[in-house]
């Protein structure tokens, strides 16, 4: 079963990462903001380009790595601020158009995010069950949206899914979570 991060755990990871003012720390904080806010896939972040951020309209264009379709999302203030700080103070001077690059030469796009996410979870003292890679932020975002009664179709669109069936595995955990809460209510009985 995939891990689910709760809102307070996500906040702890973001606060912990924001304290690291090194170039890698500024980059990681911006990436974690994207993961936490939008539930993006690792590949969507790694392939994000500088021109995908439109500061004038305050939007971010996301190319979904599985479907190659684009989604235009509102650029939230925390995400925009983290990206801006990274661009001004953390990103090395390079001709690479990818937004997030390695902090050491050769400056090219990141290969993977898994080890960075694992390290940042550990640094924040967050110990989720099961896997600890970037995808747990995606599951957390989908679960949070379902708990907020956002329709499954909208959740799927935000996650870049072409079909509602693709969204179902993300929502199964939230449904089980809600069922567990219902079973704990006084006066409810479970029949075997």
From Swiss-Prot:
Tagged with keyword Metal-binding: no
Q: Which UniProt keywords apply?
A: DNA integration, DNA recombination, Plasmid, Transposable element, Viral genome integration, Virus entry into host cell
Domain of life, per lineage: Bacteria
The GO molecular function terms of this record are: DNA binding
A Pfam family for this UniProt protein? Phage_integrase
Name the residues that span the membrane.
none
Q: What GO terms describe the biological role, i.e. biological process, of this protein?
A: DNA integration; DNA recombination; establishment of integrated proviral latency; symbiont entry into host cell; viral genome integration into host DNA
**Record keyword Cytoplasm present:** no
CDD domains for the chain: INT_RitA_C_like
Domain called Tyr recombinase: residue spans = 1-183
The record's active-site residues are: 41, 66, 135, 138, 161, 170
**Which PANTHER family does the entry link to?**
PHAGE INTEGRASE-RELATED, TYROSINE RECOMBINASE XERD
Which family, according to UniProt? Belongs to the 'phage' integrase family.
Name of the protein this chain belongs to: Putative integrase/recombinase y4gC
User: Mind giving the lineage of the organism this protein is from?
Assistant: Bacteria, Pseudomonadati, Pseudomonadota, Alphaproteobacteria, Hyphomicrobiales
